[in-house]
Regions:
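N-terminal presequence-like segments and the immediate start of the first folded domain
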Residues: 1-83, 88-140
Length: 140
């Protein structure tokens, strides 16, 4: 995954990331490429596991781009906590497998400093019909 991912434009009245006392918090990032969602729908119901993992990777790359946009120049980033929200039905239980796509994107860019503590949470819907949304907290 490229380290030159542009910061996604906010889809509402918020900023992509906020830095405070050496910690960066991101807004929820969806899998947008050039402002367009990679896919829409619910995982396990039109979105298969492979596509969901790819969408999670794109969302995580977007979150990391948001972190970099407010982190001090030259900061050695360390991903502390990631929350991956997955739009799915009650019967879908491979949440951690979807979130592994997001973790892989972070580790691909930052090495072991990109491997965060993590939660994977199933939800009924996400903004604009996105299948995944990623929030990231990083030390900068």
């Amino acid at each position: 995954m490229s380290t030159d991912t542009p910061v996604p434009s906010p889809q509402g009245d918020y900023v992509p990331a906020v830095a405070h006392d050496g910690v960066v918090y991101t807004a929820g990032m969806t899998p947008r490429v050039d402002g367009v969602l990679l896919c829409t729908g619910r995982v396990g119901d039109g979105i298969d596991l492979e596509l969901a993992r790819r969408a999670a990777a794109v969302a995580a790359a977007n979150a990391l781009a948001a972190v970099r946009s407010v982190a001090p120049d030259g900061a050695e980033l360390r991903c502390l906590k990631m929350t991956v929200f997955i739009a799915c039905g009650a019967e879908f239980t491979a949440l951690s497998s979807v979130a592994d796509g997001a973790t892989g994107a972070l580790v691909g860019q930052l090495g072991e400093r990109g491997r965060p503590a993590r939660s994977a949470i199933g939800v009924s819907s996400l903004p604009s019909g996105a299948p995944v949304e990623v929030e990231l907290v990083c030390a900068a």
